[in-house]
């Protein structure tokens, strides 16, 4: 299995459409955007996933050339050298450790290239798989924010995690990263 991180391209629209159609839990992570057509997916890629420094960066997780997910960095705060990180993996690619490796790789890149000191993320308490990704990538739990997220009429508690540049590196494989600006 050849896994790389690379920038999103408009040609990834079909893979994004398939991921959204077969992974209904992604709708909240993708902002409840309608991704039912190739045109809609192309627009989403251009507006949301082709972000470039200094605003942030999204990278496609590619498996044997196919888009399997995303790992991203946003809300960069240069005064405090912090940022928010996030990830998702399409249903058919879950359970292979892809998100953990991608998050660990993005973290190293954020510390080295962006010269950030603290990375933060959060996951719903009812998402133990996301918690396992965070912990596996070296992010320690810091606390629970009650009723932080709202999807539809339902509110969710969120566990926050952080990783510092001075924290020990996790024992996971880092992924090759292709042509990141």
Can you annotate each of these PLM segments?
Residues 1-24, 58-181:
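Acyl-donor (CoA/ACP) binding surface of acyl/acetyltransferases
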